[in-house]
A protein has these predicted regions:
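Short phosphate-binding loop-to-helix
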Residues: 18-69, 78-81, 85-88
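Hydrophobic helical membrane-anchoring modules
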Residues: 169-195
Length: 195
């Protein structure tokens, strides 16, 4: 889907794995480097890996890009319409970033609890006991991790993908907010993609 975008001019895959690098190239992306191990640990941030990729490409080619779009491979349900709408919103609103989010339906923050001394208590937002999902307000959203469209300098200078007063949402429908973190997530995504 990403290759169909009317905005994206380069598709760079950042990986530390040679097999993934070859698959990326076979699928039409560029993978001109292997990411250094310092940016590939469990402690490394996505931002540091993105900054490395942008700096590497800009240094090699002597160019500076205006916008950077991160499309996470663990979120395979996004469409070219989602990608382009995020970029259009970034440009038209002059936002620092536009990130994909989806509405929390049955997992509203008011339903989050903590256990202290074997007793359940509200985590941060009080829940009215026996409240129905549709009664929980305000509507709550969570980052889907699917699309991060950013001004280049917001990433490279500020070191962020979101969080400024000028970060905006792109609301993904629930069915396109699949995030693969576990084997069960993978099975669900595979079923949906084969549907």
């Amino acid at each position: 889907e990403a290759l169909k975008s009317k905005f994206i001019t380069r598709y760079i895959v950042s990986t530390d794995d040679e097999e993934i690098q070859q698959v990326a190239i076979q699928c039409g992306a560029e993978a001109p480097f292997l990411r250094p191990s310092v940016f590939s640990t469990d402690e490394a941030s996505s931002v540091s890996a993105m900054q490395h990729a942008v700096a590497w490409v800009e240094r090699q080619e002597g160019v500076e890009y205006d916008y950077i779009v991160e499309l996470m491979c663990t979120n395979p349900m996004k469409t070219v319409e989602d990608i382009d709408a995020s970029i259009e919103k970034l440009i038209s609103t002059k936002a620092d970033s536009v990130i994909a989010v989806h509405q929390l339906e049955d997992h509203h923050p008011a339903r989050i609890k903590k256990i202290i001394d074997d007793k359940i208590t509200d985590f941060c937002i009080p829940e009215i006991p026996e409240s129905r999902r549709q009664d929980l307000k305000p509507e709550a959203y969570i980052r889907s991790g699917s699309i991060y469209a950013l001004k280049r300098d917001y990433l490279m200078v500020e070191g962020k993908r979101y969080g400024s007063d000028n970060s905006r949402p792109y609301i993904l429908p629930q069915e396109r907010a699949v995030n693969i973190d576990t084997e069960i997530d993978f099975i669900i995504a595979e079923l949906m993609l084969n549907k």
